[in-house]
Amino acid sequence: MAAKDVKFGNDARVKMLRGVNVLADAVKVTLGPKGRNVVLDKSFGAPVITKDGVSVAREIELEDKFENMGAQMVKEVASKANDAAGDGTTTATVLAQSIVNEGLKAVAAGMNPMDLKRGIDKAVIAAVEELKKLSVPCSDSKAIAQVGTISANADETVGTLIAEAMAKVGKEGVITVEEGSGLQDELDVVEGMQFDRGYLSPYFVNKPETGAVELESPFILLADKKISNIREMLPVLEAVAKAGKPLLIIAEDVEGEALATLVVNTMRGIVKIAAVKAPGFGDRRKAMLRDIAILTAGTVISEEIGLELEKATLEDMGQAKRVVITKDTTTIIDGEGDKALIDSRVTQINQQRDEATSDYDREKLQERVAKLAGGVAVIKVGAATEVEMKEKKARVEDALHATRAAVEEGVVAGGGVALIRVANRIAELRGDNEDQNVGIKVARRAMEAPLRQIVANAGEEPSVIANKVKAGEGNTGYNAATEEYGNMIDMGILDPTKVTRSALQYAASIAGLMITTECMVTDLPKEDKPDLGGAGGMGGMGGMM
């Protein structure tokens, strides 16, 4: 085992604090409407320019191992805030830096670190309750656009695009961000249920100009099995031909003579047919087939529940207004399913999502909800260069997370004002002893830090403006973009309650642990062993050949 380097007490805390400040100082220059960019060098490709706090934090590794420990702990604050709310990483870092700096000053002055931490925790619990009281619901498109605009660093087009996307696919809908091909940002909405499976044979194509299959008011046969024998299909095909409607077959697979017969029927014009593989694999495929069945008012033909393909009737078929199939995707538009049954299915999947343990499962369940609830929106980010594209895409993703958080828990006044108001509201809070009271003061002082940093980044004097804002009431604050005072909500400067809450809780949690640190242990750097030097020739052997 490698030898260790151990530091105690003040020596350890000074080193740790230096690391905290290096990382936090790099991150906090990005805060607010007049925050600056940070350029990150990459081992390959062009440097990345970003205003995203967590992206900056993730890049920082310090040479001194004790300083690096401090930096890594603050990095954890930014990452946790990002995971919980998708935004607020810079605010969380600024809060953590303030708590650690003020807290360690108090420890150096002889306060008990454990009581300090208890005081900080008490203040944060009280502050979160007050934040919830200040929170107002965020339901209309205007408020959603404002939240998106603020989070995307005052880019109004991004806020408007996100609000449009949410209006079209619902607040539960899936909205994804992709790199576009032009200079303009675009919104592409896929209505209905779309899944990643295309037609099984190009002979099904009936729109050669687009290379797609379009079926108007088709019957939809859902089978949880491979279909290779055409005899199983004959009763269904005859019934559909009599009804004079097209047929879409969604099965585990359609192969061999069954597929050949379907192609021949289509080419001869006897009946319009298209076949696609069912989406997903294993249990997820079964669940998605059931989703499609509920959406289209059909039944999944499965031997597990005693249903056989030969005995299937038109009553077992699902129906939709229109189906469009390309070589890669199938889209079912306006299924005939009962609204109440669809809502019940959405509730059931949401419950599964809340209980899911892995991010992958949660994401897949959320996609299923969106497909049932109304569709998928894709925001295509436009930019002139790849460097700008990456920076802008990161901002749009942040803005999207922020708007989701706003819809979930509501909004509070932005620009650091909500935390100032909360700090005033808990002014009378007291701990069990004087050291805890100092901890409460440390937390309250930290709640001013985001506003002070926003003002400093705008080139103004933080103390003057912070005192003016503190003297105000309600949502009155300072708009750093226009350099004027006013009602932050009316000016459209909003922060999602969830983002502010998460930033405060994670900052206090990790900063509190750092204040109570008494010892730090790390590996000693390995010393390079000296080279053995060139091995000399063996003496006395020169005459040998």
Swiss-Prot record:
Alphabetic keyword roster: ATP-binding, Chaperone, Cytoplasm, Isomerase, Nucleotide-binding
Disulfide bonds: none
Any one GO molecular function term: unfolded protein binding
Enzyme Commission number(s): 5.6.1.7
Gene3D superfamilies: GroEL, GroEL-like equatorial domain, TCP-1-like chaperonin intermediate domain
Residue segments, region Disordered: 526-545
Catalytic activity: ATP + H2O + a folded polypeptide = ADP + phosphate + an unfolded polypeptide
Enzyme class: isomerase
PANTHER family to which the protein is assigned, alphabetical: 60 KDA HEAT SHOCK PROTEIN, MITOCHONDRIAL
HAMAP family: CH60
Quaternary state and interactors: Forms a cylinder of 14 subunits composed of two heptameric rings stacked back-to-back. Interacts with the co-chaperonin GroES.
Biological function: Together with its co-chaperonin GroES, plays an essential role in assisting protein folding. The GroEL-GroES system forms a nano-cage that allows encapsulation of the non-native substrate proteins and provides a physical environment optimized to promote and accelerate protein folding.
Name of this protein: Chaperonin GroEL
Organism: Sodalis glossinidius
Gene: groEL
